[in-house]
Each structure stands twice: as structure tokens, then as C-alpha cells.
């Protein structure tokens, strides 16, 4: 098989995200943060797999709106940008 199709040199194992149990009331808030962190790290696929939600999930909108307000208050422009992108995607 051609080396072009072999990924033996890929680094490390899959990302691990710490989340509460799915039936925990704080799961959705934690999932929103994980999705934003995954996007920031260029690994949305792993974050989506870990949470069961896609980036822009409308159900997470209230949590992301809170994160956006926190980011604006803290002057965290990158998190603000990601939260705004999440909210735009969910509005489609």
C-alpha cells in the first residue's frame, strides 16, 4: 500500500474531553464549552464526538450566549469570536 494512504505517523491518541454524565443538568453547559474549545484547537470533530452535539447546536444557544457575555466582559476576543460563530451557525 502506498505510504500516502498509511497514517502510522499520526501523533498521539484521540482528544479526551472531561464532561459530566449526559443526565447531569450541567452537561449542556459543559458541552458548549467543549465545542468552543475544540473549535479553538482545530479539533471540532473530536469535540462533537465527545458531546454528541454539532458546532452550532441550537439547544446549546443559551449556554453559548452566556459564554459570549463572559468573553466580552473578560476581553477574550478569541472566545468571543468562536461564540459568535457558533451562534451564527445555529441560526441557519
Predicted features, each with a name:
Residues 1-63, 85-92:
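Long, non-catalytic architectural segments outside compact domain cores
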Residues 69-92:
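Amphipathic alpha-helical binding modules
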Amino acid at each position: 500500500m502506498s505510504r500516502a494512504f498509511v497514517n502510522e505517523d499520526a501523533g498521539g491518541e484521540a482528544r479526551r474531553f472531561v464532561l459530566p454524565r449526559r443526565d447531569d443538568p450541567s452537561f449542556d453547559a459543559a458541552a458548549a464549552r467543549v465545542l468552543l474549545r475544540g473549535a479553538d484547537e482545530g479539533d471540532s470533530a473530536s469535540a462533537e464526538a465527545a458531546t454528541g452535539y454539532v458546532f452550532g447546536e441550537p439547544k446549546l444557544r443559551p449556554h453559548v450566549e452566556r459564554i459570549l457575555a463572559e468573553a466580552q466582559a473578560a476581553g477574550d476576543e478569541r472566545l468571543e469570536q468562536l461564540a459568535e460563530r457558533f451562534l451564527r451557525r445555529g441560526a441557519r
